[in-house]
Curated annotation (Swiss-Prot):
The lineage of its organism: Eukaryota, Metazoa, Chordata, Craniata, Vertebrata. It comes from Bos taurus. Residues 305-423, 782-825 are annotated as: Disordered. Phosphorylated. Phosphorylation on Ser-427 and Thr-447 occurs specifically during mitosis. Gene3D superfamilies: Tetratricopeptide repeat domain (1.25.40.10). Pathway: Protein modification; protein ubiquitination. This is Cell division cycle protein 27 homolog.
Amino acid sequence: MTVLQEPVQAAIWQALNHYAYRDAVFLAERLYAEVHSEEALFLLATCYYRSGKAYKAYRLLKGHSCTTPQCKYLLAKCCVDLSKLAEGEQILSGGVFNKQKSHDDIVTEFGDSACFTLSLLGHVYCKTDRLAKGSECYQKSLSLNPFLWSPFESLCEIGEKPDPDQTFKLTSLQNFSSCLPNSCTTLVSNHSLSHRQPETVLTETPQDTIELNRLNLESSNSKYSLNTDSSVSYIDSAVISPDTVPLGTGTSILSKQVQNKPKTGRSLLGGPAALSPLTPSFGILPLETPSPGDGSYLQNYTNTSSVIDVPPTGAPSKKSVARIGQTGTKSVFSQSGNSREVTPILVAQTQSSGPQTSTTPQVLSPTITSPPNALPRRSSRLFTSDSSTTKENSKKLKMKFPPKIPNRKTKSKTNKGGITQPNINDSLEITKLDSSIISEGKISTITPQIQAFNLQKAAAEGLMSLLREMGKGYLALCSYNCKEAINILSHLPSHHYNTGWVLCQIGRAYFELSEYMQAERIFSEVRRIENYRVEGMEIYSTTLWHLQKDVALSVLSKDLTDMDKNSPEAWCAAGNCFSLQREHDIAIKFFQRAIQVDPNYAYAYTLLGHEFVLTEELDKALACFRNAIRVNPRHYNAWYGLGMIYYKQEKFSLAEMHFQKALDINPQSSVLLCHIGVVQHALKKSEKALDTLNKAIVIDPKNPLCKFHRASVLFANEKYKSALQELEELKQIVPKESLVYFLIGKVYKKLGQTHLALMNFSWAMDLDPKGANNQIKEAIDKRYLPDDEEPITQEEQIMGTDESQESSMTDADDTQLHAAESDEF
C-alpha cells in the first residue's frame, strides 16, 4: 500500500506540536522508509532533534548528502550542540577546503532562514575566539530580522556596543515583510458599513493541527496519488478541499462566541489580562485577549478579504451553507472531482468553553491571491501539491462527524436553531460582493489591505520600541553602568517590568552595586511571580550568602535542585548553601557538579576557585579561574580571583595586572579600585594608591572597605589627623566594627594621647573579644579566612610593641580585609 505523503506529514507535525515525540518519530521513520526524499529526511531529523536526540539527527543527516538549506541548517545546529564547531562552520560557511561564503552568499542560499543561520555562525565564531567575525554575523542577522533578541544579547556580552535605536527598527518594507510568515490571518474591520451588514472576521485554521483522527480514509477499490492539482498548490493553508476538511460542532464564525471568548491569559507579549485596552503594548488596541493555547492573537493579518452572504435563517439553503454573492456556484460540499474553480475555506473553530450556538460549519470561498513563489504551509499540503493530480473517478474522503451530528451524504443544511438574525447583527457585518468580480477571481481589497498592513506595521513598531528600551537597559548592564540600567528598566511598562527576565536584570544590577538588600528584595519578587525560573538564581544565592541568610539559601537550593537537576544554577545555589555552613568539601562537590552539567558555565568555575582558595589549594584555584576566563574572557570575576591569589602569594605586580584587567571590563567597580589601591600601597606607591582609593570612594561614598583602606594608607604615611577624620566618618557607617576602633586607638597612640588610645582599644575588645566577628571581613568575604585561623586579639595587640601592632595590622587585619572578597562578585 502506498503511503500518502502529505497526510502523514501533517500528522507528524501535529504530533510534534502536541509534544508527542514518540509518535512523531515513529511516523517520520515510516514516511522516510516509504519516500526517500530530502523533505522526509529533514522531517525525521527534526523529530529526532526535538525529542532531544541531537546525536541521532546528526548521524542521520551526516550519512546522507544534505542539499537543502533546511537540512544544512539543522545539521549545523546539531554540530554546535555536540561541540563539533569546526564541522558546523564548514557546513554553514564553506570552511577550509571550500571557498569561504560571504554573508550575501549565505543570504542567497538560506533565504528566509539566513538570519538564524548567521546567528548560529556568529555563535561558532565567538566560541572559537574570532569575536570580530562573530560580531559581523550577529549584526547582519539583526539587519535581516530585527525581531531577534539573542544576537543583540550576544553582541553585548562579547563587549560590543550595538546601538538599540539603529538595531531594532524596520528599515524598509522588505525588512518588515521578510519577518512575517507566509500565511497570515485576515482581519477586515469596516465600521462605516451599515449595521445590517455584519463584519466578517476570518481566522486561519491553526497551523499543522489538521484533525486527522476525524478523517475516514477509504482505501478500498481506490488509489490516492500523493498530490493534487498543481493549479492550487500555492493556496493558503486554510484553503482545503471540502472533501478533506473535518467538520465539527461550533465552527460557525457567526456564533456569538467569537466576541464572547473568555478573557484569560496575558495580553500580547506578556501583558496582564487586566491591562486596560487603552494602553496597548505595541501601538494597536487588542481586539480580544487570547485564551491559553489560542495563537490567533499573535498571527498577522493577510492581504485578502473574504466575505459571504448568509441565506435567510428561516429557509435553509438546499445547495450550500453559504453562497458567494448572487452567483450560482457549485455546492461547496460537491463530490465532483471537477469542481476546481472555487476552493472553499473552513473557518477555524472557536475555543470557547461556553455552549455551542451553531452546529453547522460556515464555509467561505476566497480567491487565490498568494504569489506563485509562496511556499504553502505544512498543514495546507494535506492533500495539495504540484507533482501529480487526483483522478476524477477516485472515491472521495469521507467525513467522520462528531457523535452528536449524523453523517450526512447529502448537502448540508443550515440548522434553524443554530443561527438567528440577532446573533448576526450582534457579532458580524457582511459585505456582498459583485458576482462578476468573483467569477474573474478578483476582489477589490485595497482598503482592507491598507488597514491590515497599517495594523501590522503599528504592532511591529510597538514591539521595536519596546525592544529598543530593553536593549538600552541590557547594554548598560553589560557595560556595568548599573544605575543607568536600573533606571531604564524601571521605566518599562508595568506588565513588562513585573516579569522574571526584567527583574532578574535589575537584581543583577543591584548585586553588582553591592546593594545586597535591594538585590534580595528584587530576586524574592522574581521567585514569587515566576517560581519556575532558574536563570539568574545563582546570583540570588550569592546575594543570600553575603547577607548570611542561611535558611533562605537552604530553601532556595532545595527548591532549585528538586525542580531541575540538570541546571548549573541549581548546583551553584547548593554549593553556596554549604559554603555558608563552612562545609567546603561538600560545596566543592556541588560546584564540580555544576561544571559537569554545563562545562561552559563560567560562574561555576569561579565559585569553585573561591572554595579551593578557602581550603588553601591555590593551584587548583588558579586552574579554575583560568578555565572561567577560557569560557568567557569578559568574566571579570575570574580575573579578580587570579589577582587575589597573586596578592596572597605576595606577587603584587601580577596581582595589580589582573585587578586592572578586571577593572577594564568593569570600570564602575569601587571594590576593584579599592583592591588596586591596596596593591599599589604594597608596591610602595602610596600617593598613587590614595588617588585610586579616592576614585573608589567617589563611585561609592559609603563603601566601608574603601574608607578603611584609605585611613590605613594615611596612617602608614603618618598623616594621622587625616586618618583620624576618615575613621570617625567610618565609625558612623559601621559603628560596631572592632577594627575601626582598633585603628583609631593606634592613631591616638601615635599622637601621644594614650588615654584615648586605651579607651578605643577597650571598645574594640568589648565589641569583638575573640576577633572573629568583624563585619568588614565577613561582608566582603570571610571565605579567605581559614576556619581554624583566628585574628589576633586586641589584648595581644595592646600588650605588644608598636612594631608588632603595625605588623598585626598589616598581616592579620589588612590582608584579610583585602584578600577576602571572593563572592563580592
